[in-house]
Curated annotation (Swiss-Prot):
Possesses two activities: a DNA synthesis (polymerase) and an exonucleolytic activity that degrades single-stranded DNA in the 3'- to 5'-direction. Has a template-primer preference which is characteristic of a replicative DNA polymerase. InterPro entries: PolC_DP2, PolC_DP2_cat_dom, PolC_DP2_central_dom, PolC_DP2_N. The gene is polC. The keyword Hydrolase applies. It comes from the Archaea. One of its GO terms (molecular function) is single-stranded DNA 3'-5' DNA exonuclease activity. GO terms for biological process: DNA catabolic process; DNA-templated DNA replication. Residues 281-332, 534-553 are annotated as: Disordered. This is DNA polymerase II large subunit.
Length: 1198
């Protein structure tokens, strides 16, 4: 580690220590559940693992194994299992306890001690009996095991089996009905919830038959299995979500990875894994069915792979036509298309985004670079941070603005074709755009292909590749780059032709058109039209050839449909007249068509090979046959994509939002208003403000005072829970595990009671304690009841101050703000709305080139734990800082800490960053702000939270708010209650301990020519890994925190729209109209297919689901909220006499039916789809039609 990096971390930890000292002093004085700060510091992964699990001795052993460079983390998990079996780690008296400790620790280790899976995803481990009397291990998994990922899920089973063998427990021997139950259950869970990988029934049965550990779990979902119910060793008839995840996404999907480790263990033998991997487990009927499926699939594959077949034929006959290498189109991203979220390109369709390799400074780690002009031209549906579902290389990506790639090409209403590289120009012309011919380039870094193990797709022929080709041809590229008269990226047409001819190099990309999208027939038509055209000066005068040294050579050709279409397909900028088409800078185009400067053809006929290349749909071979220079494929790979989630920058509230975790039952009304509860009385005889609620039963250890508060009202000592057995009415002391078992009846005692609380006194006392009046806020909201184990309420004083400053409490007492995650490795002070002086005060002394930092436009490399907040987050943090200062001053009696008057005062302050599925917070430092609705941070910061940037969103908390107000006592006592809670904090990020996806990000300033050439052959990414430096290459070196170079710059991190149109448009109908209108404009999109998919995946399921819900609905009292299966006969609520109403209304059932029918007709959907809609329409009409009898008159019968 470099000295300046060490200084950075020392500064962070010094600021953290200052905040910790203030928080410690404050918690001694207030009414918090404990006097200690409840978020322990973990300086490394070993600390996190031990703190989350609470198992002494684990951290020391993990550090020993981490120090061994030859020991992988998976192997370390197995070593730890042996330690648990041999009583070297942990203090477990039972064999089941040892297995449980080993499994939990293995999952914690494999997830870097960050996610909640080890404590929430594994409920318990127990010993059961086989039919032969032997014992076996049964593991109860729960839903939160999902956050561990498939590898950790699968290895948890292997660790359990390994531990089992070491302590002498037999294997699980599945009964036949249990095997069948597993198969039915996985199918049910996949239909109801969905699995990333859903094994077939025969595969599931095969795994269940051979699994040495019984996989069990808690019931999830409402659906129950129809067969194999009420089994003796299975507690529920519902699908067990945790078990399904481990068996499907773990064992079945990760079998090859498990086999790698079973082969290293003498004690564990899973020979059946090879059959699972090879698919040789099939027998009988299933084999026949599988063969039939395979036959069907082979025909499809053969159709898709026709190009490959042609290519192989080319080996036999040298001149045989063949197509260029191309990745197969993938349609998976189009599944589950939602109304209002547009498709930007069908799979690999011309006109869609063009793949370009590289990494911008705000790019990488599952993001996609898009030109800001393209964002505006697609009606602002894409903004910074918007998620897109993409064809390749991954499943999804977060959008980032990159203005150093090519922008979109559009056709205007007057017929002109123009490329747009300026976002301001895009805004000016977008109302006049008739069609979007091309969406521009789509930047993807090489590391994404490594991470997804996706074969490299052919690269766009970009300037960075061409300059290396030019250098290989003998040019002094460095001298050209240094010359003020030469622009290597955007040269003049004359210069581009000179280079091509002098050095025998390929034509510059600026003048290399998309010949691979043009068929040979239209190529010939364009060549013929060009030969019939003439050169014109800008004033329209006709010339036979362009003058020597002319700055612009304008070609005028006769207008015809084939010629116009050819120019549009090639993306040649031109203007359209009544009878002519005018092309500026046309000399490279003319020469590419095989014409002389005098517009004379140099060829008569194309060869058979050129005419037949790629079935005549690709003119690249024809161009290279007639042009006097080499012409490369400009954009061979198109990437289909559609909009996913919109970007997010919003405060995190409970639903509904509350200010304090203090229970008031129903007394606060629908608003949960504490002031209303303070005056509430059930009857005239009741005392106003007295409310019966369920709270903790606690006792002061110093003076024996009984109370429900965390602190004794008499002596202010921290109170302890008092456990009482309801049946025996005796006090029970808890054991070491915290469970209180009655010695008489052996039932579990609890420390909860129903008690009458005088809310009026509590409320008035709280206002008095902090010196506030009721007019300091509009409303103070509490909760109806507490969901924590001991039901300890939070002091109302904190809620008063939150309400005053307009912030709310989360489930653990903290104040949070959510933002979409995006990466950035270098920043400018100007775009962060800070000054160079402010950055220098934070330790940024030099820019990325080593020059002293003096100006706001200099690029500086971002420190690993520095974060950039959205404007919304900055305002929220400012309000939170005011709340914390008032809390310190008015409640704890200390000096204010932040004294923040505006958001500049937040710069340099520490925050917690945290992902929803984890239990570990990461300390960060604010260095600036952005107008985009996202949170920018170093990729390693996001990876430390076990997140990438494919559209994920995480929260930030002001550091001192978390230290003062977080308490485990407030966390819900239910499955998943400890997820999304900072049970531990990481004060320093170790790159070696974060999620390894971030290690696959490339950190170079340019890609070598050999890499680009390898993409033409669609090489495996591993074959070129030695050519490009990745983050993992610097681990353990002095540069592991530095040197994150980029290939592309961008002018502003927030370029393009601040918000996606999905968030600014009105109702769903308005969004869908905009979606379909955009589909009509995009050349790469089939609007009929979009309409069909919206109806099939959104409208039809919604209408059918709402129709079913209407028939099964409950009714609800509008006053007290009481629910009934049917409306009481009186029509009034039995509890309060209020009006009872439906919970599902006619409007929600038929809201989409008319629109769906209209869309199906307008966009020419299949007759099958139209018939389904008509049938549904009749079903809806039959339910809601007015069938009351009308009085008939005699005239009705005449």
């Amino acid at each position: 580690m470099r000295e300046d990096d060490e200084q950075y971390f020392r500064r962070l930890e010094s600021d953290l220590d200052t905040a910790l000292s203030v928080a410690r002093e404050a918690r001694k004085r207030g009414g918090d559940p404990t006097e200690d700060i409840e978020i322990p510091i973990a300086k490394d992964m070993a600390d996190r693992v031990e703190n989350i699990l609470g198992i002494d001795g684990v951290a020391e052993r993990v550090r020993e194994m981490e120090a061994d460079p030859d020991l992988s983390r998976e192997e370390a998990a197995l070593e730890l299992a042996a330690d648990f079996a041999n009583d070297e780690v942990g203090d477990y008296e039972t064999r089941a306890g040892k297995v449980e400790g080993a499994v939990r620790t293995a999952v914690a280790l494999l997830t870097e001690g960050v996610v909640a899976a080890p404590i929430e995803g594994i409920d318990r481990v127990e010993l059961l009996e086989n039919d032969d009397g032997t014992e076996f291990i049964n593991i109860y998994y729960a839903g939160p095991i999902r956050s561990a990922g498939g590898t950790a899920q699968a290895l948890s089973v292997l660790v359990a089996d390994y531990t089992r063998t070491l302590i002498g427990i037999d294997e699980y021997k599945a009964r036949n009905d249990e095997t069948e139950r597993y198969a039915e259950e996985l199918s049910l869970y996949d239909d109801e919830t969905g699995l990333q990988y859903a094994p077939k029934d025969e595969e599931t049965k095969f795994i269940a038959e051979h699994m040495p550990i019984m996989l069990d779990g808690e019931a999830t979902g409402d659906e129950e299995v129809s067969g194999f119910r009420d089994l003796e060793r299975v507690d529920t008839n519902s699908a067990r979500g945790g078990m399904c995840l481990v068996l499907g996404e773990g064992i079945a999907q990760k079998a090859p990875k498990i086999q790698r480790y079973t082969s290293q263990l003498d004690e564990v033998d899973w020979p059946w894994l090879q059959d699972l991997i090879d698919g040789t487990y099939k027998t009988g009927e299933d084999t026949d069915e599988a063969d039939a499926d395979s036959d069907d699939g082979t025909d499809e594959d053969a159709a898709d792979d026709s190009d490959i077949d042609d290519s192989s034929a080319g080996d036999e006959e040298a001149d045989a036509p063949s197509g260029p290498p191309r990745p197969d189109p993938q349609k998976k991203f189009l599944r589950d298309l939602i109304a209002g979220r547009p498709v930007f390109g069908h799979p690999s369709e011309p006109g869609g985004f063009r793949l370009r390799y590289g990494r911008a400074r705000n790019h990488g780690f599952a993001t996609a670079g898009v030109h800001p002009a393209a964002m505006h031209l697609i009606d602002d549906f894409l903004a910074t941070g918007t998620q897109i579902k993409t064809e390749r290389p991954g499943k999804a990506a977060g959008v980032v603005p990159v203005d150093t790639i090519e922008g979109p090409t559009v056709k205007l209403a007057n017929g002109d074709v123009r490329r747009v590289d300026d976002p301001e120009e895009a805004l000016e012309i977008r109302n006049g755009v008739e069609a979007i011919l091309d969406l521009g380039e789509y930047l993807v870094n090489y590391g994404e292909f490594v991470e997804n193990n996706h074969p490299l797709s052919p690269a766009a022929y970009a300037p960075e590749w061409w300059t290396q080709d030019l250098a290989a041809a003998g040019a002094d590229v460095q001298a050209l780059a240094d010359s003020p008269r030469v622009d290597l990226e955007h040269p003049s047409a004359e210069q581009a032709l000179e280079w091509a001819e002098r050095y025998d190099a390929p034509l510059h990309p600026e003048y290399t058109y998309l010949w691979h999208d043009l068929d040979v027939e239209r190529f010939e038509a364009l060549a013929a039209a060009a030969s019939e055209g003439h050169w014109a000066e800008t004033d329209g005068a006709q010339q036979t050839r362009p003058p020597d040294g002319a700055a612009e050579s304008t070609l005028v050709v006769p207008r015809s449909e084939p010629v116009r279409e050819a120019l549009e397909v090639l993306l040649v900028e031109h203007t359209q007249g009544e009878e002519t088409l005018t092309v500026p800078d046309a000399e490279p185009l003319v020469r590419s068509l095989g014409l002389t400067e005098g517009l004379e053809r140099t060829w008569d006929e194309l060869s058979t090979a050129a005419r037949s290349y790629d079935d005549g749909d690709n003119a690249v071979r024809a161009v290279n046959e007639v042009a006097p220079f080499e012409v490369r494929e400009r954009a061979p790979t198109r990437i289909g994509c559609r909009m996913g989630r919109p970007e997010k920058s919003e405060k995190r509230d409970l639903s509904p939002a509350v200010h304090t975790l203090f229970p008031i039952g129903e007394a606060g009304g629908s608003q949960r208003d504490i002031a209303e509860a303070a005056t509430h009385a059930e009857s005239m005889q009741d005392t106003p403000g007295e409310v019966e609620v369920q709270v903790g039963r606690r006792q002061c250890p110093a003076c024996d005072t009984e109370t429900f508060r965390a602190r004794c009202p008499d002596c202010e000592s921290v109170t302890d829970p008092r456990y009482v057995c309801y049946d025996c009415n005796i006090d029970v002391d808890p054991d070491e595990s915290g469970r209180a078992i009655c010695p008489n009846c052996e039932r579990e005692a609890d420390a909860v009671q129903n008690r009458t609380v005088n809310v009026h006194e509590e409320y008035r006392s709280a206002l008095s304690n902090v010196g506030e009046r009721e007019n300091a806020f509009d409303v103070l909201k509490g909760v109806k009841g507490l969901s924590s184990e001991h039901k300890v309420p939070e002091p109302i004083e904190k809620g008063v101050l939150r309400a005053k400053h307009g912030v709310s409490a989360f489930k653990d007492g903290t104040v949070r703000y959510d933002m979409t995650d995006l990466p950035v490795t270098s920043v400018r002070a100007a775009e962060l709305d800070v000054t160079a002086d402010q950055l220098r005060s934070l330790g940024y002394e030099t820019d990325i080139h080593g020059e002293p930092l003096t100006h706001e436009d200099q690029l500086v490399e971002l420190r690993v734990q520095d974060v950039v907040l959205s404007n919304g987050a900055a305002e929220h943090m400012l309000r939170t800082a005011d709340f914390v200062d008032d809390l310190l001053e008015q409640y704890y009696g200390l000096e204010p800490f932040y004294d923040a008057e505006d958001r500049d005062d937040i710069v340099g302050e520490l925050v917690f960053g945290m992902a929803p599925h984890t239990s570990a917070a990461v300390v960060g430092r604010v260095i600036g702000f952005t107008s985009a609705a996202v949170g920018y941070a170093h990729p390693y910061f996001h990876a430390a939270k076990r997140r990438n940037c494919d559209g994920d969103e995480d929260c930030v908390m002001l550091l001192l708010d978390g230290l003062l107000n977080f308490s485990k006592t407030f966390l819900p006592d239910q499955r998943g209650g400890r997820m999304d809670a900072p049970l531990v904090m990481s004060s320093r990020i170790d790159p070696a301990e974060i999620d390894d996806e971030a290690h696959n990000m490339d950190i170079v300033s340019s890609y070598p020519r050999a890499f680009f050439e390898a993409t033409r052959e669609m090489a495996d990414p591993g074959e070129v890994e030695s050519l490009i430096q990745l983050g993992e290459d610097t681990l353990g070196t002095a540069d592991e925190y530095r040197g994150f170079e980029h290939t592309h710059d961008t002018v502003d991190l927030a370029a393009g729209p601040d918000l996606s149109a999905y968030k600014t448009l009105g109702d769903m109908m308005e969004k869908m109209d905009a979606q379909l209108e955009l589909s009509r404009k995009l050349r790469s999109v089939d609007e009929t297919d979009v309409a069909e998919r919206v109806i099939e995946y959104h409208f039809l399921p919604d209408i059918i689901g709402n129709l079913r819900a209407f028939s099964r609905q409950e009714t609800r009292c509008l006053d007290c909220g009481e629910k009934y299966r049917r409306v009481p006969l009186t029509g009034d609520c039995r509890e309060c006499g209020g009006r009872v109403n439906l919970t599902v209304h006619q409007g929600s059932v038929n809201k989409y039916i008319d629109t769906a029918i209209q869309v199906a007709e307008e966009y020419g959907c299949r007759e099958y789809t139209k018939q389904r809609l008509r049938i549904l329409d009749r079903a809806v009409e039959s339910i809601f039609e007015d069938d009351t009898n009308k009085q008939s008159g005699i005239a009705d019968f005449m």
